[in-house]
């Protein structure tokens, strides 16, 4: 249903819906929204198809995550309406060399919803040589 709706209405409706669901603390500017809409123009059908296939795709990838031998910092918004925080915990459990940060009172776009905390997380992660703990 939604794939048909967004195919008919196009990227603006798709992005508007995502913004309503994805942010708790941040309101993107008109310029940011326009840029985001432009990036999805003509691609809404394939993008919604990708989202529909996401759970199946994870089944193919998940078994290989344990072999990933690089530090990974998983970050997530606690109130993510698209991908629940339980997904972050599962991903963290599958990655042998990972850290997990779940931002409280935060939606899907945590890099904007909690920009100060996110910036500090990245700064610390990079400055500490991607070390865990």
Question: Which residues does each PLM region occupy?
Answer:
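Short beta-strand segments
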Residues: 51, 75-76, 102-103
């Amino acid at each position: 249903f939604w794939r048909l709706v967004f195919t008919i209405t196009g990227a603006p409706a798709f992005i508007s819906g995502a913004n309503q669901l994805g942010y708790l603390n941040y309101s993107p500017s008109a310029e940011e929204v326009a840029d985001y809409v432009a990036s999805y123009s003509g691609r809404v059908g394939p993008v919604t198809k990708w989202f529909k296939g996401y759970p199946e795709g994870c089944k193919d990838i998940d078994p290989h995550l344990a072999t990933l031998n690089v530090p990974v910092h998983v970050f997530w918004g606690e109130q993510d309406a698209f991908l629940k925080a339980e997904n972050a915990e599962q991903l963290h459990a599958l990655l042998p060399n990972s850290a997990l940060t779940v931002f409280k009172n935060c939606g899907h776009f945590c890099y904007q919803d909690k920009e100060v905390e996110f910036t500090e997380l990245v700064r610390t992660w990079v400055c500490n040589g991607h070390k865990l703990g």
